[in-house]
Amino acid sequence: MSDKLPWIIKYRPKRVEDVVDQEEAKKLFLPWLRSWLQGRIPERKAALFYGPAGVGKTSLVEAAANEYGLELIEMNASDFRRKSDIERIAKIAATQFSLFGRKRKIILLDEVDGISGTADRGGLDAILELINITKHPIVMTANDPWDQKLKPLRDASLMVPFYRLSERYVVQVLKRICAAENIECEDEALKLIAQRAEGDLRSAINDLQAIAEGYGVVRVDLVRALLATRDRQYSPWEMLRNLFMSKYIWQAKRAVTHTDLDYDTLLQWINENIAVQYTHPEDIWRAHEALARADIFLGRIKRSLSWDLLPYVFDLVGPGVALARKKSKFKWAKYQFPQKILMLAKTKEVREIREAVAEVFAKRLHTSKATVKREVLPFLFIIFRERPDYAARIAIGYNLTDNMIKYLAGPLASKVKEHMNALLMRLEKPATVSTATTATTARTTAAETSVAASRAAKRTSTSRRRTSKSRRRGKGSGTQTTLF
C-alpha cells in the first residue's frame, strides 16, 4: 500500500488486453476504431457502449487511447447543457489534429443516458450534430440505452454490448492487486467479494481496498462482517442473460426475483426470448411448457387471490426455464423487446377511444361496457361505414366526439360530418318560419272545421224534415188500419 491513490485508478487497464472478459465488445470496437485510424471513416461515426456499471466501458476507451497514442477528450452528460459548451465541443470535434502535434483524438461522452431530451438545452440534438460533423471517433457510454429518447443515438451509433464479469475474472484481478500491494488474502475471501460484487469489478476493487487498508489482511470473516449483500435490481436484458446462463436453481430463481418487472411483463420477456436463446426444439418445448404452467398459476392467483401460489410461479419461470436447456449451448444473443408490449404501446390511443365509445353507449343503453364492445360496436362499425346519414343521427344523439367518429367511421368520417352539419342546419331554422307555418296550419284547420260544421248542420236539418214527414205518414196509416 505505497500511496493513497484509489486502486480503481491505480490499477486501471493500460492496454486493451488488460480489459478482461469483454471479448465481444473488443471484436466490435477495435475494427471500427482501426478504420478511423486508417483514414476510412466508418458509416457510423459513433459507438455506443452499453451495459451495467463497473464492467469496463470507460476503461476500454482509455486503454485503446493509451495503446494507439490517441488524445482522449472525456466529457460527461452535464457538458451538454449550455450552448457555449456545445460550440466548444463542436470545435474540438471539427478540428483535424491536436494542438500538441499531429496526434489524433478520440472523444468520450460518458453517461449519455443521463441527458434529458427536453429539459437540457441542446441535449441529444447537440450530440447528433457532433456525430454529423466530427472528424474523430466518438464513443458514448450508457447503462440503459433502451430509453425511447435515445433511439436517435442508437440509430446513429455502433452498438457495443458489455456484460457483467464472471466471478473467475474478478477473482483474478483481485489476486493481482493483492500481490502488487503485498496484501495477505484468502482465496475464499476474494471469491466472496467477487460474488457479492455480482460482476461489478469497480465495486469489488473498492471493497478489497476498504478491507485491506483497514485491517491489513483479507479474510473470510472480515468480508462477511463488513460487506452486506448488494440487492441489485436487474434490467430486463440482465435478467434474461442471468437466467439463461444459470447452472443452478438458486441462480435462476435469483435472476427472476431481482427485477422490477411485474409478473405478466416478466412472462412476456421470457416468452419472447426463449427461441432466441435456445436452438433445439425439445429445449424450446420444455421451456414453454414451464412458462405455460407458470401462467396457469398466475391466473389462479389473480382469480382467487391465493398469493401462497406465487413461489411456484417463480420456480417455473426461473429454474423451470433455465434447466430446460439440455441440448442447446449457451450463446451471446441479442434479446428482443416483447412484441405484445410494443403492439399495446402503439395501439394505446385507439384502445382509449374504444373504451370511451363503449362508456358513452353503456350509460345510454343501461348495460356494461363489455356488452357494448361485444354486441353493439360491430353494428356501429357497419352503420358508420355503410350509412353515413344514419351515423350522423347517432353521432348527434349520443354527442360523439371527432375522435370517436373517426374511430367508428374510418375513411368515411368526413361524410358523416357532412350529414351531421346538414342535419343540424335543418334543426336550427329560424323560429319565425315555424310560427308562420303554425299560423297557416291553424287557419287551414279552422276553415276545414267551419266547413265540416256547416255540412253537419245541413245534414241535421234534412234529417229533421224527413223525420217529421215520416211521423205524419205513420198517423195516417194507423187510421186506415183501424177502419178496416
From Swiss-Prot:
Gene Ontology MF: a single term: ATP binding
Start-end of Low complexity biased regions: 435-455
Entry keywords, A to Z: ATP-binding, DNA replication, Nucleotide-binding
Binding site residues for ATP: G51, P52, A53, G54, V55, G56, K57, T58
Key word ATP-binding present: yes
Residue ranges the record marks as coiled coil: none
Region (Disordered) location: 435-484
Biased composition (Basic residues): 456-475
GO biological process entries: DNA replication
SMART domains noted in UniProt: AAA (SM00382)
Record's function text: Part of the RFC clamp loader complex which loads the PCNA sliding clamp onto DNA.
Protein name: Replication factor C large subunit
Protein species of origin: Hyperthermus butylicus (strain DSM 5456 / JCM 9403 / PLM1-5)
